Amino acid sequence: ADLHNKDRALVLTSGYVANEATLGVMSKILPGLVILSDEKNHASMISGIQRARCDKIIFNHNDLYDLESKLKTLPLDTPKIIAFESVYSMDADIAPVEKICNLADKYNALTYIDEVHAVGLYGPNGGGVCEERNVQPDIINGTLAKAYGVQGGYIAADKTFIDAIRSYAPAFIFTTSMSPVLCAGALASVKYVKEHKELRMMLQVKSEELKRKFIDKGIPILENNSHIVPV
């Protein structure tokens, strides 16, 4: 929670489970909900949205015009959530998170962002793209694997929302929690990465070097503005 400047966080067994469990019970928390989902969202987000059994609208990938045109069709008092990622793993592009959050404010929508490929790697403390760009989405999904090298996933949000997920999500209620050993390891890793900004800088440098080497060898890669190298 502290990493993302949120009131509370809830740890689940993986980032996949955190996405699926959270999005899957949204309609119970917000009756009449409409979820607006980026067309390239991760399978875990898609699965969660399907489980929610609420109305959903797919918008073109990172397309602000298309997103706004779809938001305009919904009444301001209709509960809505914009679900998207910060860094997309397949194309390696970064979403315009500030502008999406601005649209959410304009049309009275909540924001749900998956920062799985960004936590530990962006921002002064490793809080992800949102920390780097100083924006505050309503709900953040992250992982304790990948950059942190341990296991587990989490969501971070305000206290009321976290309490609701804890009460409704079967994937949290009816399974064994992470072991204290893994929790201790994850906490130590988060603290370490927070304090060592040079690791984030080093990764970006190595990523750019690898991209150049592929290009020099004639191996095509997708151009992007993140650390991921899609060949």
What are these regions (language model features)?
Residues 14, 36-52:
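Substrate-binding/gating loop at the entrance of the active-site cleft, primarily
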Residues 57-113:
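Active-site phosphate-binding strand-loop segment of PLP-dependent enzymes
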Residues 1-21:
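Short loop-beta-helix segment that forms the pyridoxal 5′-phosphate
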Residues 201-208, 216-231:
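Conserved PLP-binding catalytic core of the aspartate aminotransferase-like
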Residues 22-43:
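Conserved PLP-anchoring active-site segment centered on the Schiff-base-forming lysine
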